[in-house]
A protein has these predicted regions:
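Hydrophobic residues in well-ordered beta-strands that form the structural core
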Residues: 125, 146, 202, 356-358
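Conserved core segment of the aminotransferase class I/II
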Residues: 222-302, 309, 313, 393
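PLP-dependent enzyme catalytic core of the Aspartate aminotransferase-like
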Residues: 86, 94, 124, 338, ...
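Conserved glycine-rich beta-strand-loop-beta hairpin in the small C-terminal domain of fold type I
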Residues: 282, 286, 301-312, 322-335, ...
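Helix C-cap/helix->beta junction micro-motif
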Residues: 30, 140, 195-196, 318, ...
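Conserved core of the PLP fold type I
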Residues: 66-193, 207-222
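N-terminal small-domain helix-loop-helix segment of the aminotransferase-like
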Residues: 2-104, 112, 288-291, 395
Length: 395
């Protein structure tokens, strides 16, 4: 038999393994010192009470003959799709119910949606990049080109007419950099996609952190995007569903390529290869969009926003350049003293007992930069910020 040898082309990822080894060695050498981890990309606040109640009620419902649910609609229950419709409508973005597809998370859909496109397509991804974008396409054998970002452009790549791409990845606010596109910038990307007959895969997993009214929370706020974009979103960051698993993808009915309607194709794909998200989880997700749900999740989001501000304020006081932190849980900073990413990791661990993520782990353009996150404990984040501030000032 023949195997998919493209899996052999995946680059070994030692980033988090190396971090774990370095932290373990430091802890063994300094058992008396407290290590504060600001590299975590997972949420830490518990699910909202109304979400837990909805889950409990749905579980109890499943234990009755009248309330039992077996196989559900592969594209999601109407009650959740309508709740998402309302969420977008509150921001003046109109969606049809049959354009919303419920999934077990953004990561799955980011990979699965590629099945709609031939492998003989060129993919444009940013550098630095969320590694999944690259790996999903390497394993399919697609050609990948990079939009190289830097401090000068605020780590927000813009269209280059000399580059032809068929599939365009945009994540805003971005992981790992925390940078977010304005509506005017997204208009340029939509124009580029339409000019090149390309499709934008818009990762909106962090839209809930946006507070700046000049920033778009959905690509569909941009005129013309319904003809060239698919939006993928998640309950992981807005509601802490990293362990509960639920997300959704929006495929507009206007989106067509080579005479094929992508909304219909995605429906066929899901009904063929996916059995849907559990009823209990979808009831929990729908509770997020209730009045009490939105109030509760805002408390958690504000908790993380305050952590981000604590870190950003410390960097401001030290005169360290960074992006993110204001509409994102990620703070992407220039390593002080012209240190390389791993050099700064070692320095930060040794001098502050603080752990973050070396920027070079996300791509060549991340060298010399470093990621801190706001998902930690508030008191520990304050302590880490003070340690960092003191150490950098002493450089």
């Amino acid at each position: 038999m023949k195997m998919n040898h493209h899996y052999g082309e995946l680059k070994a990822s030692y980033l988090f393994v190396d971090i774990a080894h370095k932290v373990a060695a430091y802890q063994e050498a300094h058992p008396e010192k407290e290590i504060i981890r600001l590299g975590i990309g997972d949420v830490t606040q518990p699910l909202a009470k109304c979400v837990v109640t909805a889950m409990q009620d749905a579980a109890a419902e499943m234990g009755t003959k009248e309330g039992f649910h077996g196989y559900g609609p592969e594209q999601g229950y109407p009650f959740l799709k309508q709740a998402i419709q309302g969420y977008y409508a509150s921001r003046n973005t109109k969606l049809d119910e049959d354009e919303i597809f419920i999934s077990d998370g953004a990561k799955s859909d980011l990979a699965n949606v590629l099945g709609l496109f031939d492998v003989d397509n060129t993919v444009l991804v940013p550098d630095p990049v969320y590694p999944t974008y690259v790996d999903d396409n390497v394993t399919d054998g697609r050609k990948i080109v990079y939009s190289r970002t830097n401090q000068e452009n605020g780590f927000l790549g813009m269209p280059d007419d000399s580059v032809k791409a068929d599939i365009i990845y945009i994540c805003s606010p971005n992981t790992p950099t925390g940078a977010a596109y304005t509506r005017e910038q997204l208009k340029e990307w939509v124009a580029y996609a339409k000019k090149n007959n390309a499709v934008i895969l818009y990762d909106a997993a962090y839209e809930c952190f946006i507070t700046d009214e000049h920033l778009a929370r959905s690509i569909f706020e941009i005129e013309g995007a319904r003809e060239c974009a698919i939006e993928i979103c998640s309950f992981s960051k807005i509601a802490g569903f990293t362990g509960t698993r639920c997300g959704y993808t929006i495929v507009p009915k206007e989106l067509e390529r080579e005479g094929m309607n992508l909304n219909k194709l995605w429906l066929r794909r899901q009904t063929t290869k996916f059995n849907g998200v559990p009823y209990i989880v979808q009831r929990a997700a729908a509770a997020v969009f209730t009045e009490s749900g939105m109030a509760e999740i805002q408390q958690n989001l504000d908790y993380y926003r305050k952590n981000a501000k604590v870190i950003a304020d410390a960097l401001d006081e030290c005169g360290v350049w960074y992006c993110g932190g204001k509409n994102s849980p990620y703070i992407w900073l220039r390593c002080p003293g012209n240190m390389k990413s791993w050099e700064f990791f070692d320095w930060l661990l040794e001098n502050c007992g603080v752990v973050g993520t070396p920027g070079v782990g996300f791509g060549e353009c991340g060298e010399g930069y470093f990621r801190l996150t706001a998902f930690g404990d508030a008191e520990k984040t304050k302590a880490a910020a003070e340690r960092i501030k003191t150490a950098i000032k002493a450089l």
